[in-house]
Amino acid sequence: MTRKFPLEQTRNIGIMAHIDAGKTTTTERILFYTGRVHKLGETHDGASTMDFMDQEQERGITITSAATTCQWRDTRVNIIDTPGHVDFTVEVERSLRVLDGAIGVFCAKGGVEPQSETVWHQADRYHVPRIAYINKMDIMGADFYNVVDMMNERLQANPVPIQLPIGKEDDFQGIVDLIKNTAVIYKDDLGTEWEEVEIPEDMQELAEEYRDKMLEMAAEYDEELMMKYLEGEEITSEEIRLALREGCLKTELTPVLCGSSYKNKGVQMLLNAVIDYLPAPTDVPPIEGVVPGKEDEEEKEQRVSSDDEPFSALAFKIVTDPYVGKLCFFRVYSGKIEAGSYVYNPVKGKKERVGRILQMHANHREERNVVYTGDIAAAVGLKNTSTGETLCSPEKPIVLESMQFPEPVISVAIEPKTRADQEKMATSLQKLSEEDPTFQTHTDDETGQTIIKGMGELHLEVIVDRLLREFKVEANVGKPQVAYKETIKAPTKSEGKFIRQSGGRGQYGHVLIEMEPLERGAGYEFEDKIVGGVIPKEYIPAVDNGIQEAMQNGVLAGYPMVDVKITLYDGSYHEVDSNESAFKIAGSMAFKDGSKKASPVILEPIMKVEIVVPEEYMGDVMGDVNSRRGRIEGMEERSGSRLIRSYVPLAEMFGYATQLRSTTQGRGTYTMEFSHYDEVPDSIAKELMDV
């Protein structure tokens, strides 16, 4: 089977936005116009094609990024729908890693919301070229120009409008196309009947001003166009498009479009822009990786986007499917792969057989015998592969850069209701943590309870909900708990000596360590400075293990210790009695003893909280934030409301949604995401230590 679409005619794009900016509706319309869906699904009816989990249809939000494929203008477009809720940043991070380009969807009224900022900066980190689509031009308070200003101020995105709206709110009738210098007026609500006309008189001046700005930006990427522009010569639409494409691919500018997906206005032009400005796999630099066993070498191995290169792909999502079992979504970066062949997972060091390959369309699927470079598909039969791992050809192994996932900040205890549920719960939680790296589970040694950890209350609610619906596990859920940690503030030296000698084989381990604090978020470092073999090499990993085990229970209140550097600099051993376990215990003793002397403190997660409230409730809401140990960073006006930016400890944020609702009579909204860990005040540390 040969390729259906050349690589240049492939687009791998994501649609990213704030919750409620209309992202799923926009995706729906794209699928409708590209002929994949014959009836439109509305998110607020709970009938949308992309939202195929029960929880999504009920809550009207998108949780798992479904990958879908469609075609437009002889080009294959693979779309990954990403969630806009802060608790699911991992899904966004995951999809950005495998995309080549993205559409940022903004609400014409809300503009650049806090979550859009987070996602935008995630995309900056991966150098993903973007176009922006200002949606909901038909709603009350829609303001295209305000959103463009916000993109400038908050995202430093260098927005370049290539369209302007004609009218707004109920009067939104059409779109000015600045590139062709014409206007499109829509005749009906299905968006299928429209006509191209001259730009309305009352808009000509504005259109000219914005067209000039656009040409000025485009001219920076094409010298010929620059000359024509300066000399006032005619410039063709194609020349403008190619120059803007150049700037967009370099992520130096963002073409801005507008429309109303719900009213079917502007979607086809958005599709054209995807093909005109966003990159094909051939436009992005070759993917880099390291050859297993040669990790220390400076030189990276490169794989060019071509079917003739050795096969390499990244598994970016694992889903448990009720019909086929474990589905592993992957993006092919080079080469091709046939169903039934073997791939190598260099991270696990295992060969696996790809049973079947499926191409997904939200929740309907097609079998593929072979997938090529640039394709996004799902494999059945990969039992050992986890999110973020590489798949490659066994003959030419490579490890592609993996993804970074944030640590979970909130935990709840969960208990099965019956004995039968107990067994099912363990396997179900295992499956869920395979799907989602920010969800972790462990058993509390003291209480024997199962503890689940995640990124926020909504995240854990969805998990518990899925246990019940998908896996039929009934469970009682405890109160959410904060993931406190401990660290040290002062450097110190410490000694650990473990000696048992009473007839027969004894035990002997003796270590001297230096402990010093690291900056927040640095984790743990272990340096071996042993010289002259005072501790034999084979025992050093045991010391490291002993210390890491001791770090699981801090000295103040038993929370995990973080951000510590350990240097092992001296010690001694006994020819006969020394062994690994003795050195492990000695390491652990040295760490516990040192921690007490190194000014230990308790840390708590601090959340970045942004609250939007009507002006009259501002005083009450700010008072409430202060009473929660919050620190207000700043305020700004936001179309009739006020936006309050603050940092509040997670411990004080439980149940905040209900409190805000009652304070503002349901008119306030807030978003919250993890920011950093900080020291707990003494009074609270005392409470935590007394528990």
From Swiss-Prot:
SUPFAM superfamilies: EF-G C-terminal domain-like (SSF54980), P-loop containing nucleoside triphosphate hydrolases (SSF52540), Ribosomal protein S5 domain 2-like (SSF54211), Translation proteins (SSF50447)
Biological function: Catalyzes the GTP-dependent ribosomal translocation step during translation elongation. During this step, the ribosome changes from the pre-translocational (PRE) to the post-translocational (POST) state as the newly formed A-site-bound peptidyl-tRNA and P-site-bound deacylated tRNA move to the P and E sites, respectively. Catalyzes the coordinated movement of the two tRNA molecules, the mRNA and conformational changes in the ribosome.
Domain tr-type G: 8-282
Name assigned to this protein: Elongation factor G
Pfam families: EFG_C, EFG_III, EFG_IV, GTP_EFTU, GTP_EFTU_D2
Binding site for GTP: 17-24, 81-85, 135-138
Entry's Gene Ontology molecular function annotations: GTP binding; GTPase activity; translation elongation factor activity
